[in-house]
Amino acid sequence: MNTTADASQNNNVGPVMRQGELAQAVVEAAEIDNPEKVIKVEDKLAYLRIQTNDEMILKRQTIEEMLGRPFSMNELEVDLASFAGRIDTHVEYIRFYHAKHL
């Protein structure tokens, strides 16, 4: 089964980020902001697929701390190539989730 088919058969959610400083900060923030979750990172050279099961929260403040500079959540859109699940965006956080579970 290929990865597209696999994606439709699980409850994984999370961003697909272009490689770079922001992607690394998002990986670190995902681990900090979701301590009870196992965060899976697939390095695809040009991008990172960052996933966990059911729900992932990324807080602006945590990403800002990882970057070491001020950060606005709309900056995420520039490097967000895609995402798994649904997305709910706010000024202070972004949430990836599933409306229905498999």
Where in the sequence are the language-model features?
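Short beta-strand
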Residues: 39-43
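Helix-rich interaction surfaces within compact, conserved domain-sized segments
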Residues: 44-47, 51-102
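Short, surface-exposed ligand-recognition loops at beta-strand->loop->(often short) alpha-helix junctions
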Residues: 14-22
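A short, surface-exposed helix-loop junction/capping segment
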Residues: 4-12
